[in-house]
Amino acid sequence: MSKEFSRTQRVSQQLQKELAVMLQREVRDSRIGMVTISDVEVSRDLAYAKVFVTFFCVGDQTPESSLAALKEHEPSLRMMLGKRIRLRLTPEIRFTYDNTLVEGMRMSNLVTDVVNTDKRKMAESGRTESDEGEE
């Protein structure tokens, strides 16, 4: 009988929940700012966890500086995880900046720019969108 979710998926979901709570309540570092854990990928042997994070940067904070500050807390977060989650081996945590949101916004802006350029060119030539379909 197959399981609905594999063990690695269940462990990654649990790690995501626990890390989110720990970052919110236990890590007191103003350099990190507001952090969101978007995904966790756990290796098949559960030895490594790649944690994808995004930041809401305020003032002079950058994602790079926030990520560097967060990486300083990797050993202590791993130790706290070991106390909260009972696994034979607590995964080594590796934080990675998740730029999918930024890339998605960039792609959306590119599409919007192209659509606006097409509309402007059509207006300059005196054609309408319904004329395009008739040709």
Curated annotation (Swiss-Prot):
<dbReference type="Pfam" id="PF02033">
    <property type="entry name" value="RBFA"/>
</dbReference>
<comment type="subunit">
    <text>Monomer. Binds 30S ribosomal subunits, but not 50S ribosomal subunits or 70S ribosomes.</text>
</comment>
<dbReference type="InterPro" id="IPR015946">
    <property type="entry name" value="KH_dom-like_a/b"/>
</dbReference>
<dbReference type="GO" id="GO:0030490">
    <property type="term" value="P:maturation of SSU-rRNA"/>
</dbReference>
<keyword id="KW-0690">Ribosome biogenesis</keyword>
<dbReference type="InterPro" id="IPR023799">
    <property type="entry name" value="RbfA_dom_sf"/>
</dbReference>
<dbReference type="GO" id="GO:0043024">
    <property type="term" value="F:ribosomal small subunit binding"/>
</dbReference>
<keyword id="KW-0963">Cytoplasm</keyword>
<comment type="function">
    <text>One of several proteins that assist in the late maturation steps of the functional core of the 30S ribosomal subunit. Associates with free 30S ribosomal subunits (but not with 30S subunits that are part of 70S ribosomes or polysomes). Required for efficient processing of 16S rRNA. May interact with the 5'-terminal helix region of 16S rRNA.</text>
</comment>
<protein>
    <recommendedName>
        <fullName>Ribosome-binding factor A</fullName>
    </recommendedName>
</protein>
<dbReference type="GO" id="GO:0005829">
    <property type="term" value="C:cytosol"/>
</dbReference>
<comment type="similarity">
    <text>Belongs to the RbfA family.</text>
</comment>
<dbReference type="InterPro" id="IPR020053">
    <property type="entry name" value="Ribosome-bd_factorA_CS"/>
</dbReference>
<dbReference type="InterPro" id="IPR000238">
    <property type="entry name" value="RbfA"/>
</dbReference>
